[in-house]
Amino acid sequence: WIMGHMVNAIAQIDEFVNLGANSIETDVSFDKNANPEYTYHGIPCDCGRTCTKWEYFNTFLGGLRKATTPGDSKYHEKLVLVVFDLKTGSLYDNQAYDAGTKLAKSLLQNYWNKGNNGGRAYIVLSIPNLDHYKLITGFKETLTKEEHPELMDKVGYDFSGNDDIGDVAKAYKKAGVTGHVWQSDGITNCLLRGLDRVRKAVANRDSSNGYINKVYYWTVDKRASTRDALDAGVDGIMTNYPDVIADVLGESAYTAKFRIATYDDNPWETFKN
């Protein structure tokens, strides 16, 4: 999965997919009542990027729905996965459940079109704080209450705080999550980060009793760091330059081992060689 980083304006969906992304990451900020409000990152952000592009969250979902609904004039067949980077740092811990509830209602209405030919992309809810695991509970219980529990088949999870892998496992246990787990690792492109924790996550993914299904690394903009991440065995790379990742995947060292994921590749299944 080539994951376009910080895609917060509707116009950027086309831009990143046209550069080679089959997945995008979108920031979601919340108001003080835990309503998802804007797709917005803000300053500071990655080096070389404009930090302040934004839409209202529900407006963005409408654009995203069009981009992922077959038959729509804006449809992109290859856009198959969306990571919502949920900026829950502005919320109190006890608001996490409410945030999950409100997020589910927004997606149900504006993205899934109440289950009636809505967008088809797989969705990852990426949460920065392990203490906010109840966001997952709120999300799940709301879709059940709204009589669309089947949509949870399209939803996965990530805790994005670079926490100890064992602590992440405990948070999933509390949330009752037993699958659909993506594990992120990374840092802003302005700084360097080694691959030690990525290797631990990959080892967990590949062990018989691990909780991780997929591992992605962020934010990778250079060919050398792309090769290092691929050599470590990641499933996804988040980038500001999808064309760079696509180029490296085309190198002879990688064409036999990797290919770009399509809609038929289940993002919740651990890849077995």
From Swiss-Prot:
Known function: Dermonecrotic toxins cleave the phosphodiester linkage between the phosphate and headgroup of certain phospholipids (sphingolipid and lysolipid substrates), forming an alcohol (often choline) and a cyclic phosphate. This toxin acts on sphingomyelin (SM). It may also act on ceramide phosphoethanolamine (CPE), lysophosphatidylcholine (LPC) and lysophosphatidylethanolamine (LPE), but not on lysophosphatidylserine (LPS), and lysophosphatidylglycerol (LPG). It acts by transphosphatidylation, releasing exclusively cyclic phosphate products as second products.
Co-factor remark: Binds 1 Mg(2+) ion per subunit.
Gene Ontology molecular-function annotations: lyase activity; metal ion binding; phosphoric diester hydrolase activity; toxin activity
Enzyme class name: lyase
InterPro entries noted in UniProt: PLC-like_Pdiesterase_TIM-brl
Protein name (database record): Dermonecrotic toxin LsaSicTox-alphaIB1avi
One GO CC term on file: extracellular region
Subcellular location: Secreted
Tissue expr: Expressed by the venom gland.
Residue stretches spanning the membrane: none
Cofactor: Mg(2+)
Catalytic activity, as annotated: an N-(acyl)-sphingosylphosphocholine = an N-(acyl)-sphingosyl-1,3-cyclic phosphate + choline; an N-(acyl)-sphingosylphosphoethanolamine = an N-(acyl)-sphingosyl-1,3-cyclic phosphate + ethanolamine; a 1-acyl-sn-glycero-3-phosphocholine = a 1-acyl-sn-glycero-2,3-cyclic phosphate + choline; a 1-acyl-sn-glycero-3-phosphoethanolamine = a 1-acyl-sn-glycero-2,3-cyclic phosphate + ethanolamine
EC number: 4.6.1.-
Species in which this protein is naturally found: Loxosceles sabina
UniProt keywords, alphabetically: Cytolysis, Dermonecrotic toxin, Disulfide bond, Hemolysis, Lipid degradation, Lipid metabolism, Lyase, Magnesium, Metal-binding, Secreted, Toxin
